[in-house]
């Protein structure tokens, strides 16, 4: 598999340090608020990476942390009249609920910052002993950025350029404006722990270094997160970890791109902030997951309701095709004969193309394109009355459904029972568009009655009235069926 390594700025052949085993760490949430679609994208991207690596036979140990002590958590605790621990527990619980709905697998290890204070203090002590960090009279501990010659290698930033814009805030006791906090002295009303420098709490960056060292062998095979974490968080992780250990921290750095909303940066000030729960009030979770896979993970993705509607339509088309294949396989009598050779060759080519897309830096957008081509191929056989009843077609239909199981295993979509999913999808669309199903059924019955009375003008008028509601009616051998346009 080829993976783009942020550190080297190129795609590289992925090969774990220990053959057959992968250790992977991804930065999790700071638990102070509901998760937004940026969190959803990062979670889905790395969920697919874990799924795919396991699909190829690799034994993956996946760790994703929770930051449960932080300035933002303390601020939220004061706003809500809760303790910091209560705030963290509240939003970790909502995180799990959101991820379960998006079919994101639980990580194997989910360390929390507050249960690793001892490890963080130990890392600070090692850095101070090596003169890579220093404690201030006030009880803060800072990392000496200039003591680490490789600072900036991940983000491509130059230390001297950073220095020109850096300032020391009033009250700080930094030796250099570039230095960053490893440990923060306690302030009134904030949670704290005892340390060699007095009561205090960890800085943000030290948390991931300490937790990854505690739970996984270093160097990590993969360390991931959103593009926004490249600097300063991941740059600082590298500096403090490699300075303390004297060896490489991570072999492959993987970062997902930003989520924009209507081509603008998502922010509360712009009024375009979208939580996962906001979106799932109007769309099924699988629609959001599917949408997040329609762009390459390193590219920005633009969230719009139009793009969600398009994702919904495409998801519907695939499930409809899978449903038809399941129904066709209920046939009891099949005629002998294979399918044309070009059909089987095209199918095998598409299977390989799907795998090749995933091997090429996890290109889910291209992989989904091959899924659609395979669905069109299946529909072509279903539409051919001569071919669809053959033994060759039966084997082909089964092979497509087997391949759909692979899509689900790797992408985490297309795994529902088609009829159930389509019914839930219709109910979701009906609710979103404010359609009254009882009214539709009433009109359909009136249309049936008009046709029975041979009042075809009335029947056509009712059909137009139904269409004006945003409803499509299809007449089938078993009766009229309707769906949302």
From Swiss-Prot:
Q: Please provide the record's keywords in A-Z order.
A: Aminoacyl-tRNA synthetase, ATP-binding, Cytoplasm, Ligase, Metal-binding, Nucleotide-binding, Protein biosynthesis, Zinc
| UniProt-listed Pfam families | CysS_C, DALR_2, tRNA-synt_1e
Question: Motif 'KMSKS' region: which ranges?
Answer: 265-269
GO CC, any one term: cytosol
- What are its cofactors? Zn(2+)
Q: Reaction(s) catalyzed by this protein?
A: tRNA(Cys) + L-cysteine + ATP = L-cysteinyl-tRNA(Cys) + AMP + diphosphate
Q: Which GO terms describe its molecular function?
A: ATP binding; cysteine-tRNA ligase activity; zinc ion binding
Residues at which Zn(2+) binds:
27, 208, 233, 237
Where is the short sequence motif 'HIGH' region located? 29-39
Q: Where found?
A: Cytoplasm
Q: Which GO terms describe its biological process?
A: cysteinyl-tRNA aminoacylation
Query: Broadest EC class?
Result: ligase
The record's EC number reads 6.1.1.16
Binding annotation for ATP: 268
InterPro entries, A to Z = Cys-tRNA-ligase, Cys-tRNA-synt_Ia_DALR, Cys-tRNA/MSH_ligase, CysS_C, Rossmann-like_a/b/a_fold, tRNA-synt_1_cat_dom, tRNAsynth_Ia_anticodon-bd
* Cofactor comment text: Binds 1 zinc ion per subunit.
The similarity annotation says: Belongs to the class-I aminoacyl-tRNA synthetase family.
Assembly information from the UniProt record: Monomer.
Protein name listed in UniProt: Cysteine--tRNA ligase
Whose protein is this, by species?
A: Nitratidesulfovibrio vulgaris (strain DSM 19637 / Miyazaki F)
């Amino acid at each position: 598999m080829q993976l783009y390594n942020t550190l080297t700025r190129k795609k590289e052949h992925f090969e774990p340090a220990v053959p057959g085993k992968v250790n992977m760490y991804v930065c999790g949430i700071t638990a102070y608020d509901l998760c937004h679609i940026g969190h959803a994208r990062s979670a889905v991207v790395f969920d697919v990476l874990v799924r795919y690596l396991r699909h190829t036979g690799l034994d993956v140990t996946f760790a994703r942390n929770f930051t449960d002590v932080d300035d933002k958590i303390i601020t939220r605790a004061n706003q809500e009249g809760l303790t910091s621990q209560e705030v963290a527990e509240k939003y970790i619980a909502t995180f799990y609920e959101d991820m379960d709905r998006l079919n994101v697998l639980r990580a194997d290890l989910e360390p929390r910052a507050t249960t690793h204070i001892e490890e963080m203090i130990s890392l600070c002590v090692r850095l101070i002993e090596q003169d890579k960090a220093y404690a201030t009279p006030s009880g803060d501990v800072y990392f000496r950025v200039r003591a680490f010659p490789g600072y900036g290698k991940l983000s491509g930033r130059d230390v001297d350029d950073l220095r020109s814009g850096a300032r020391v805030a009033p009250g700080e006791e930094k030796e250099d404006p570039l230095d960053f906090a490893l440990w923060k002295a306690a302030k009134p009303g904030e949670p704290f722990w005892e340390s060699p420098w007095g009561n205090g709490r960890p800085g943000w960056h030290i948390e991931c270094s300490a937790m990854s060292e505690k739970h996984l062998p270093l160097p990590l095979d993969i360390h991931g997160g959103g593009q926004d974490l490249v600097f300063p968080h991941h740059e600082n992780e590298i500096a403090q970890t490699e300075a303390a250990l004297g060896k490489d921290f991570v072999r492959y750095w993987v970062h997902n791109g930003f989520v924009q909303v209507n081509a603008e940066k998502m922010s509360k000030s712009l009024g375009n902030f979208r939580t996962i729960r906001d979106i799932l009030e109007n769309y099924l979770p699988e629609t959001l997951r599917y949408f997040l896979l329609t762009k390459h993970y390193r590219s920005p993705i633009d969230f719009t309701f139009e793009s969600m509607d398009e994702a919904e339509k495409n998801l519907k088309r695939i499930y409809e095709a899978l449903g038809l294949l399941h129904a066709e396989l209920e046939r009891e009598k099949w005629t002998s004969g294979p399918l044309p050779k070009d059909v089987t060759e095209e199918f095998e080519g598409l299977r390989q193309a799907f795998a090749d897309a995933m091997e090429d830096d996890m290109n889910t957008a291209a992989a989904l394109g091959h899924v659609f081509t395979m669905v069109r191929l299946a529909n072509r056989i279903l539409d051919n009355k001569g071919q669809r009843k053959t033994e060759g077609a039966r084997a082909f239909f089964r092979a497509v459904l087997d391949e759909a199981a692979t899509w689900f295993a790797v992408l985490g979509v297309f795994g529902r029972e088609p009829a159930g999913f389509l019914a839930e999808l219709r109910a979701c669309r009906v609710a979103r568009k404010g359609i009254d199903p009882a009214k539709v059924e009433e009109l359909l019955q009136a249309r049936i009655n008009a046709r029975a009375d041979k009042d075809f003008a009335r029947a056509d008028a009712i059909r137009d009235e139904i269409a004006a509601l945003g409803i499509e009616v299809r007449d089938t051998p078993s009766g009229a069926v309707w769906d949302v346009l």
